[in-house]
């Protein structure tokens, strides 16, 4: 049987630590593309690396792959034309930079394009950028914690748990093993986006305010945990109202499972990693705005959500470009101006945040 081929943009943690693993377990020929030339050179020179489960110490070897620098346009285009699966994990705000690779290129008839990105239906968003037949695009929900361990090694340390759910479009669709498929992907995207991504980053922002370094440290703080539980209660109410397949008890269990994942000491998940790119996290196809919209729709308590928004605007990390942009806007203009520019909140809710600060 002829092997499927896959091309993946993004040789970072998710690309090396999850997507390559899936492609290799599916016995596929695959290639990685990245903007980091040193990383690509290392991958080509070493020709293999290990994925190490930090919970069980199991090791899985990744090998027999190709690796291309982003400036190897001709090679990348050849792979795009030959690929059965084309995927990304570069951050959805960077997807427009890939448009040139799809110009004057003929995809295979049943080629699938999958964006393994945090956000709402990002593959559909990518389709709007490329303006290619939507039948090629498969939306995805992907969940795995892969911390940034400081090391010169290509090896990746990962948690045991992972979940990938892909959109089931039709019966003739080529399927990957070791992933799940659903015809109701929106429900699963939002469940993961709200109860994994939003909860995770919120722990980060609240933890930063109390000067913690790691997520597990912040989660041991009872004041932070209390706020997380308040936010989660609202989220669970939203999800159970929006999607009949989710009962509140199931969502509570799902939350507790995720809190246990986040609290694993060996994880060593840096708050600076989890809280990065706050402007992106506040955008309209991301976690906080989607929760905000549904809170307004169902007329639920909004105070805890606005408190979380406030903590995001207090996040001041000089090493993070988006955080620095927010802070310089506050410094050079005002918090009111920054809220208007970045929060996407209604005017009345921006004013509630400002009034809550004025009372202090």
UniProtKB/Swiss-Prot annotation:
Catalytic activity: D-mannitol 1-phosphate + NAD(+) = beta-D-fructose 6-phosphate + NADH + H(+)
Binding site for NAD(+): 6-17
Signal peptide interval: none
Top-rank taxon, per record: Bacteria
Enzyme class: oxidoreductase
The EC number(s) this enzyme carries: 1.1.1.17
Any one Gene Ontology cellular component term annotated for this protein: cytosol
GO annotation, biological process: mannitol catabolic process
Keywords for the protein's UniProt record, in alphabetical order: NAD, Oxidoreductase
Disulfide bonds listed in the record: none
Entry's Gene Ontology molecular function annotations: mannitol-1-phosphate 5-dehydrogenase activity
PANTHER family: ALTRONATE OXIDOREDUCTASE-RELATED, MANNITOL-1-PHOSPHATE 5-DEHYDROGENASE
Family to which the UniProt record says this protein belongs: Belongs to the mannitol dehydrogenase family.
UniProt-recorded name of the protein: Mannitol-1-phosphate 5-dehydrogenase
Gene: mtlD
């Amino acid at each position: 049987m002829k092997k499927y081929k896959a091309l993946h943009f993004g040789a970072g943690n998710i690309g090396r630590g999850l997507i390559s693993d899936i492609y290799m377990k599916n016995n596929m020929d695959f290639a990685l593309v990245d903007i980091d030339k040193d990383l690509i050179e290392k991958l080509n020179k070493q020709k293999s690396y290990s994925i190490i489960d930090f919970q069980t110490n199991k090791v899985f070897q990744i090998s027999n792959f190709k690796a291309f620098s982003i400036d190897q346009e001709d090679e990348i285009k050849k792979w795009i034309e030959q690929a059965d699966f084309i995927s990304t994990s570069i951050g959805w705000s960077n997807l427009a930079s890939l448009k040139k690779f799809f110009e004057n290129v003929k995809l295979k008839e049943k080629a699938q394009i999958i964006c393994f990105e945090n956000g709402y239906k990002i593959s559909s968003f990518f389709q709007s950028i490329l303006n290619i037949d939507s039948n090629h695009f498969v939306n995805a929900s992907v969940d795995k914690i892969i911390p940034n361990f400081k090391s010169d090694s290509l090896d990746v340390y990962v948690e045991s748990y992972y979940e990938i759910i892909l959109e089931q479009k039709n019966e003739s669709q080529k399927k990957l093993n070791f992933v799940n498929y659903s015809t109701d992907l929106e429900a699963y995207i939002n469940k993961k986006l709200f109860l994994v991504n939003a909860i995770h980053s919120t722990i980060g922002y609240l933890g930063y305010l109390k000067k913690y370094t790691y997520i597990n440290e912040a989660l041991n703080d009872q004041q932070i945990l209390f706020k997380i539980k308040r936010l989660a209660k609202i989220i669970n109410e939203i999800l159970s109202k929006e999607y009949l397949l989710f009962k509140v008890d199931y969502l509570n269990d799902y939350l507790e499972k995720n809190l246990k994942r986040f609290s694993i000491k060996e994880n060593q998940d840096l708050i600076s990693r989890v809280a990065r790119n706050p402007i992106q996290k506040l955008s309209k196809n991301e976690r906080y705005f989607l929760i905000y919209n549904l809170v307004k729709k169902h007329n639920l308590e909004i105070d805890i959500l606005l408190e979380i928004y406030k903590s995001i605007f207090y996040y001041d990390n000089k090493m993070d470009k988006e955080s620095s942009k927010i802070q310089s806007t506050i410094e050079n203009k005002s918090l009111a101006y920054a809220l208007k520019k970045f929060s996407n909140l209604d005017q009345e809710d921006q004013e509630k945040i400002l009034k809550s600060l004025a009372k202090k």
